[in-house]
Amino acid sequence: MKLLRFLVLSPSGIKLDKTIISAQVKTTEGYIGLNFNRAPLIAAIQSHLCKIIFADQTKREAIIGAGLMLIKKTEAKIFTENFVFADEVDINETLKRKTELERKIHHIKDAKLNVKIEQNLMFELLKLSSKKK
């Protein structure tokens, strides 16, 4: 079985660089499966819970923030500011961050900044929902 190189990149660096069997990613058009030899694609992605099967058959879920995805036959890259594995989420830190973002969103009048805050709030809510499973 041929494997796909899966990278998650952010302004702060490489968040993930592993070979995978498959991953399920949510684009603005819906979920798509990633695996080796997939047709090339560039797509916007939404904040979502991504299911990944790694080359060693282990399965993990990750919360990925909104961003952009570039797929080639042998490689998939996701460009996002937010990425964390679901099993590494700190509930207390996430709740503090959520409260802070909710406070900010009510006081900011700048539409562009509000969109950014909404995206970050969505990411924090996904982190919390992943822990309720």
From Swiss-Prot:
SUPFAM superfamilies given in the database record: Epsilon subunit of F1F0-ATP synthase N-terminal domain
InterPro entries for the chain: ATP_synth_F1_dsu/esu, ATP_synth_F1_dsu/esu_N, ATPsynth_dsu/esu_N
Gene Ontology molecular function: ATP binding; proton-transporting ATP synthase activity, rotational mechanism
Its membrane topology: Peripheral membrane protein
Localization per record: Cell membrane
Pfam families recorded: ATP-synt_DE_N
GO CC, one annotated term: proton-transporting ATP synthase complex
Record key words, sorted: ATP synthesis, Cell membrane, CF(1), Hydrogen ion transport, Ion transport, Membrane, Transport
SS bond partners: none
Matches recorded under HAMAP family: ATP_synth_epsil_bac (MF_00530)
Function, in words: Produces ATP from ADP in the presence of a proton gradient across the membrane.
Similarity comment text for this entry: Belongs to the ATPase epsilon chain family.
Subunit structure: F-type ATPases have 2 components, CF(1) - the catalytic core - and CF(0) - the membrane proton channel. CF(1) has five subunits: alpha(3), beta(3), gamma(1), delta(1), epsilon(1). CF(0) has three main subunits: a, b and c.
This protein's name: ATP synthase epsilon chain
